[in-house]
């Protein structure tokens, strides 16, 4: 597997820490560890008492239990913790797709959403966001993109880079669409809070 160079990361490597004004990053405003711990009284004791060894491969049980509370109908044993989006995308493609498969990816988008699959030999079709529609993608176009080889639909909500966020109704229709066509749905929700509270 030979992925294409990650253009955004190459750009950041050159400019992220030297630009006078950085307007192209999605990082939140940073804070110190003491500022973070101040959100929960007594948490410094918990941090200082934390064990730094290996944990179970799906992630620390306490973390998985806490993550499960964020989603309706998801048990903690159905959660696998990753170190970031790159690892999760790679794991999904490696485990769920084969070189003869086809994936539909909401575009424009985060490069890894399509380039990792392409590096594995998966054929990728763009499901294009339309500026004139507020960056929503056309549902009829999605239907037309499905082939007998299609195995996955990849979306990002809120969408990167446009910021489009589907209504609950639209999101539910996308969720229902995937199993109706025998597809895995990979929904990258790296930016769900606070903007996605309505879902």
Regions found by a protein language model. Give the residues of each.
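Aromatic/hydrophobic pocket-lining residues that form π-stacking "cages" and hydrophobic walls in ligand
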Residues: 91, 113, 174
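Active-site phosphate-binding strand-loop segment of PLP-dependent enzymes
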Residues: 131-197
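A short helix->loop->beta-strand "cap" motif at the edges of active sites that frequently abuts
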Residues: 101, 122, 180-183
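Conserved PLP-anchoring active-site segment centered on the Schiff-base-forming lysine
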Residues: 95-117
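Short acidic capping loops at alpha-helix termini that bridge into adjacent secondary structure
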Residues: 75-79, 100-102, 149
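A short helix-loop-beta submotif of the ANL/AMP-binding
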Residues: 118-124
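N-terminal small-domain helix-loop-helix segment of the aminotransferase-like
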Residues: 1-84, 91
